[in-house]
Amino acid sequence: MADDIDIEAMLEAPYKKDENKLNSANGHEERSKKRKKSKSRSRSHERKRSKSKERKRSRDRERKKSKSRERKRSRSKERRRSRSRSRDRRFRGRYRSPYSGPKFNSAIRGKIGLPHSIKLSRRRSRSKSPFRKDKSPVREPIDNLTPEERDARTVFCMQLAARIRPRDLEEFFSTVGKVRDVRMISDRNSRRSKGIAYVEFVDVSSVPLAIGLTGQRVLGVPIIVQASQAEKNRAAAMANNLQKGSAGPMRLYVGSLHFNITEDMLRGIFEPFGRIESIQLMMDSETGRSKGYGFITFSDSECAKKALEQLNGFELAGRPMKVGHVTERTDASSASSFLDSDELERTGIDLGTTGRLQLMARLAEGTGLQIPPAAQQALQMSGSLAFGAVAEFSFVIDLQTRLSQQTEASALAAAASVQPLATQCFQLSNMFNPQTEEEVGWDTEIKDDVIEECNKHGGVIHIYVDKNSAQGNVYVKCPSIAAAIAAVNALHGRWFAGKMITAAYVPLPTYHNLFPDSMTATQLLVPSRR
C-alpha cells in the first residue's frame, strides 16, 4: 500500500507542481491584485485625504479671510462711527436730525450702507432748521400811495353793531367799490369793538358812493358813513406849522358821555386828529364809574380845534358828545393845581387826628348827631389848631368846587356855540307860526317851498312839518351829507315870512327814532303843486 501510495504520489507530483505553479501564479496574481487594490485604495485614500486637507485649508483660509474682512469692516465701521459721532457732536448744537433713530439707521445700514447715511445726514444738516421761522413771501406793494392819497380813499364808519366783523364791512361796501383795507377800532383790554371803523377803497370815486350808504342797516343796525378828515387835519397842521409854528397844547372839555365810556375809548376817537398828551376822565369814587365828562389835552392847538369842530355833537353810545374849549389857567387854578395830581388822589389830604375830629364835628352840626365826649374834650384842648386845619381844608374844597363849576359852565357855553357834526338830516326853525296859520293846506305849501329850495342842492327824500311846534320846525332828510350841507348853508340865516330861518343838524339815529318811515326812504320828493 505504501508503494501504491508512493507511485501515486510520484505520478501526481508533476501535476501538483503545475498546480502549485498555477496556485503560486494565482496567488501571486491575487497578491498583485491585492497589492494593486491596496495601492489604488491607498492612492484614493491619499487623494481623498489630500482633497479633505485642501478643503480644510481652503476653509481655514476662507475663515481667516472672512475674519480679517470682518476685522477690517469692524475697524472701518468704528472709524466711520467715530467720524459720524464727531460730526453729530459738531452739528448737535445747531440741528438734530429727525432721522437719527435706531430704526432708520438700521434700515439705512442694511440697505444703502453707512457712507450714504452720512451723506444723507449732511444733506439733512444743511436743510432748514426747525427753530428758524419760514420767511413770509415778499408782498409786492399794491400802489405807492402817500398818506394823503390813502386818506382821500378812506371813510369813517360809526354806530356799528357789536358783533360786526371786518369781513361784514368789506362785503357791505364792496357794492360801491373794491375795498382795500378795513380797520376796526377795538378796546385795548377787552378787544371788543368800539363801534367805529375806517374803510379804505382802491378808487377815490368809491368814497361818495360809500357815504351815500349812510342809514343802511348792517347786522340790524343803521350805519353812519362819513369822509375821513385826517387829510384836512394834516394839511391844516402843516400850514400852521409853516406860518407860525406850533401854538402849544390845548385842553378840551368833553361832556355828556355815557357812564360806561373809558379813557381808552376816548383816545381811540380823538387820537386821529393829532397827538394827545393826556386824557383825564372824571370818575365817581363810590361807584367807580365815569361822571360823564372829562378833559383831553392835545399837543397842538390846531389839532384840538379840528377835533372840536368835527366831534362836537358826535353820537357815542347813543348820546351826542359835547366838546368845547377850556378857559386858560388863572392864579386861583394854579393855586389849586396840587388837587389835580394822581398822588393826592391816591393818598388824600392828611389833616391829622385833631383835624379829623374837628371835621367830624363840623359835619355833625345841624344833623342832630352827638360826637363822643372824649372827642369833644380833645377838641376843646386844641381847638385853635384843629379849626385852622379844618378851615384850610374847607377852603380847598370850596376852591375846587368853584373851579369845577366855572370850568364846566365855560365848556358848556363854548360847546353850545359850535355847530354839531354834519349829517344827512337837519331841522329848520322859524318857518311858520302855528297860531297865525289859518288857511287850509298851509303845511303843504311850506313843505313844497322847502322841497323846491332843497332840490337846487341835491334834493329831499323825507320831510315833515311839525304843525304843533311853537318854534315852527320842519324836519328834512337829504340823500347825502353833501346835499344836506349845501341846503343848510343856503337856508341858514335867510328870511322867510318875516322871520330868520335857523338850520341845525340832527343825528341820524335821532331822526330815525322820530320818523321810522324815513329809514327806508330813498326816492327824491317833488312839490305836490305840480
Curated annotation (Swiss-Prot):
Protein role: RNA-binding protein that acts as a pre-mRNA splicing factor. Acts by promoting exon inclusion via regulation of exon cassette splicing. Also acts as a transcriptional coactivator for steroid nuclear receptors ESR1/ER-alpha and ESR2/ER-beta, and JUN/AP-1, independently of the pre-mRNA splicing factor activity.
Phosphotyrosine sites (modified residues): 95
SUBUNIT field: Interacts with NCOA6 and JUN. Interacts with ESR1 and ESR2, in the presence of estradiol (E2). Interacts with RSRC1 (via Arg/Ser-rich domain). Interacts with SF3B1. Interacts with ZNF106 (via N-terminus).
GO biological-process terms attached to the record: mRNA processing; regulation of mRNA splicing, via spliceosome; regulation of transcription by RNA polymerase II; RNA splicing
Phosphothreonine carried by residues: 146
Region (Disordered) residue spans: 1-146
Gene from which this protein is expressed: Rbm39
Residues modified as N-acetylalanine: 2
Top-level taxonomy: Eukaryota, Metazoa, Chordata, Craniata, Vertebrata
One Pfam entry name: RBM39linker
Residues covered by region (Interaction with ESR1 and ESR2): 355-406
Residue ranges, annotated region (Interaction with NCOA6): 406-530
Annotated GO MF terms: RNA binding; RS domain binding; transcription coactivator activity
Residue ranges occupied by any RRM domain in the UniProt entry: 153-230, 250-328, 445-508
Residue numbers bearing the Phosphoserine modification: 97, 100, 117, 121, 136, 334, 337, 341
UniProt keywords, alphabetically: Acetylation, Activator, Isopeptide bond, mRNA processing, mRNA splicing, Nucleus, Phosphoprotein, Repeat, RNA-binding, Transcription, Transcription regulation, Ubl conjugation
Region (Interaction with JUN): 291-406
PANTHER family, A to Z: SPLICING FACTOR (PAD-1), PUTATIVE (AFU_ORTHOLOGUE AFUA_1G15810)-RELATED
Signal peptide range: none
Composition bias type Basic residues, residue spans: 33-56, 64-95, 119-130
Protein name: RNA-binding protein 39
InterPro entries from the UniProt entry: Nucleotide-bd_a/b_plait_sf, RBD_domain_sf, RBM39_linker, RBM39_SF, RRM_dom, RRM_dom_euk
Covalent cross-link Glycyl lysine isopeptide (Lys-Gly) (interchain with G-Cter in SUMO2), where: 111, 119, 244
Cellular component per GO, a single term: nuclear speck
Family, similarity comment: Belongs to the splicing factor SR family.
CDD domains reported for this sequence: RRM1_RBM23, RRM2_RBM23_RBM39, RRM3_RBM39_like
Compositional bias annotation for Basic and acidic residues: 14-32, 131-146
